[in-house]
Amino acid sequence: MSNMDFLPISKEDLKKRNIDVLDFIIVTGDAYVDHPSFGTAIIGRVLEREGFTVGIIAQPNWNNIEDFKKLGKPKYGFLVNSGNIDSMVNHYTASKKKRHDDFYSPGGKSGYRPDRAVIVYCNKIKEAFKDSPIIIGGIEASLRRFAHYDYWDNSVRRSILEDSSADLLIYGMGEKPIVQVSNLLRYGMKIDSIKNVRGTTYIEKDIFSLKDYIEIPSFEEVSTNKKSYAEAYKIQYYEQDSIRGKTLVQKHKERYVVQNPPQPPLSQEEMDEVYALPYARTYHPMYEAEGGIPAIKEVKFSITSHRGCYGSCSFCALTFHQGRVIQNRSQDSILKEANMMTNMKDFKGYIHDVGGPTANFRHRACKVQEKHGTCKNKQCVFPKACKNLIVDHKEYLSLLRKIRKIPNVKKVFIRSGIRFDYLMYDKNDEFFKELCEHHISGQLKVAPEHISDKVLNLMGKPTRNVYDSFVKKYYDINKKIHKNQFLVPYLMSSHPGSDLKAAIELAQYIKKMGYIPEQVQDFYPTPGSLSTTMYYTGINPLTEEKVYIPKDQKEKRMQRALLQFSIHDNYDLVKEALIKAHREDLIGNGPDCLIPYNKPYKKSHKKNNAKNNNNHYNKNNNYNKNKDISKKNKRNSLSKHKKRK
C-alpha cells in the first residue's frame, strides 16, 4: 500500500493531494492504523466523507514543538485523543509498575507517548498555535469529563477540560457529534458558541441560560468529601441515556463543566455506513521498518458486529463510553466485510472474532428501550434477568452460519467474550451447541471474575450457581459432540468487597477446578467505573452502603497469591493469609488443604505441583468426573492463556 491509501501525515502528502490548508488535524497517542477498530481512523474517515480534509499527527514528540507544526495550522481546529486506551492504563500496571511494551506503538515498544497524553498534547498545541480551537475525545477524555478519582495520583483531579484547556470535549461514540460540530464550524460559528450539541461537554462561566439541568456536587466538594463524590457519581451513572438523560453541571471554582445529554445511538444504517468507509485496514507504511504495529494482529481479521453493552459490570466503564443500548450492523454489512477479508493476501482462512463488547448481545435488551430509554434504577441482567429482556440467539447464529459458508473461510472464532448468564437464560440450546462445535478452538474464555456471592453482587455479576450451571452444561454439550474442550475463567483479586475470607473461598474453588490459573487480574481502579468509585469512597454509590476495600498492599498481594496458591514463590504469602484468617485447617496434607505444612523445595515443585493438580482434577472436578480428557492437552491449552487487557 502507498501513502495515498491513508489520510495525509506529511507536507508531501498534502502536496500530492493539492491541499494547502487542512480543515482538521487529528493528534493521537497511538500509531496511525487505518482500521475501524481505531477511533482516529473512524473519525478521520467520517470527516472525509463529509467533505473535510483531515491530516494525522500520530505520536508526536512532545518535547519538540515542531512536531505539532508539521502539517501547519488547520482551518477549523485540532482533534486530540490519547489513543484506544487511557495513556495511564497503557503505561502502568495495576500495581503502578511501568509497562515495557505498547501494542499500539511501533514494534510494540513503549515510550512513544507521554503520561496524560491528552493534557500534554493540548498544551503543546496551544504553545504552537495559541488561537487554534482544540476538541478532545476518545476514552481518556470521555471518562475524565467530570472531576474524577485518579488512581495514579491517588487524588481527585479536575475535569480534563480544565487541565487541558481544550475548547470542547466529545464523549462516547464520536461520529454524530463530530459531524454536527464540524458543520457548525464550517457555517462560521465560533467554537466557544457551540453549546447545544448532544454528546459534548464544555466550560461555562455562568449557567443562567441553562434549563432542565441537574447540578452535581462541585469539584471542591467531591475532592474533600467522599459521600459527595459518591453522590456525584450516582447522578452521572443514572443520567447517561439519550432519551431520559438530563444536562449535568459541575462547578469548578468560579466556572462550570456542562455535559449535554448523550447522542442517540447510531442506527443500523449509520453503523453500516461507518464500517463501509474506505479504510486501508492496516498500519501506515512508515512503521514497516520498525516491525509494524502489533495491535493490528488481533483485529485485522476480526469483525465488529455491534457496540454497547447492557451487562453493566461494575468494573467496566462502557456505560459511560459506548452506552447500554446495543447498536448493531446489518448482516449484509458484516458479510461484505467477511467476503472482503477473504481476498486479502495474508488471509489464512480464519476470522478471529465476530462480536463486540459482549459477543452474544447482538440486539437491544428490550423494546421498552426504544421509546423510554434504559431503565434508571434497574439493570437488564443483574441481579437476574429482567422480565422484559429479549433472550434470543437466533439472529446471531444465523449470521455465524452465513459467514461459515463463505468460500475460503475455514473457521470463525468468537473471542470477544460470551455472557454466560444470558446464554443460560436461552431455553434453546442451538447456539450453545454450535458455539462449542464451530466457534472455539480447544478452550472457551469466560469471565466469572469471582465465586463469592457478596463480591459478585458488588461486581454486578451473576451468582456462583449460575456459573456452576453453565460449566456443567458446557461440559455436557462437549461430551455429546465428542470434543475435549476446556474453560479458562478470568478471575479478579482485590475487587471492592473482597476480603481474605472471600479470597480463600475463591482459592478453594480453584482447588476443586483442578488447575491453577496462569494469569490473575488484580482489580485496576480506572476512571469512570462504578468499582473505582467504590474503591475511592468505600461506598457503593447506588445503595449508599459501606464497602470493604482491600487497599493495603500486603493484603492485595495475599489475595493474588491465594488465587495461585501452588506457585512456590507464593507459599509464604498464602500461609500468612491463612493464619491471619484463622484458616489453619487449609494448611497440611489433607485433600482440601491449599498448601502443605512445610515449604516444598523449589526444584521439585513444578513437577510435583503438576502431578498434584492432575490428581485434584480427577478427584474433585464435579463437572468432568467421567470425561476422558488428556491432562497434557489441558496444560498445553492453559499455557496459551494471555493476560486480559
UniProtKB/Swiss-Prot annotation:
One GO MF term attached to the UniProt entry: 4 iron, 4 sulfur cluster binding
Residues at which [4Fe-4S] cluster binds: C309, C313, C316
Positions of the UniProt region annotated as Disordered: 598-645
Compositional bias (Basic residues): 600-609, 632-645
Alphabetically ordered keywords of this record: 4Fe-4S, Iron, Iron-sulfur, Metal-binding, S-adenosyl-L-methionine
Cofactor names: [4Fe-4S] cluster
InterPro entries assigned to the protein according to its UniProt record, in alphabetical order: Elp3/MiaA/NifB-like_rSAM, rSAM, rSAM_horseshoe, UPF0313, UPF0313_C, UPF0313_N
One Pfam family this sequence matches: Radical_SAM_N
Cofactor: binding comment: Binds 1 [4Fe-4S] cluster. The cluster is coordinated with 3 cysteines and an exchangeable S-adenosyl-L-methionine.
Protein's UniProt keywords contain Ribosomal protein: no
Biased composition regions of type Low complexity, renumbered to the chain: 610-624
SUPFAM superfamilies assigned: Radical SAM enzymes (SSF102114)
Domain spans labelled Radical SAM core: 295-566
UniProt family annotation: Belongs to the UPF0313 family.
Protein name: UPF0313 protein CLI_0267
Organism whose genome encodes this protein: Clostridium botulinum (strain Langeland / NCTC 10281 / Type F)
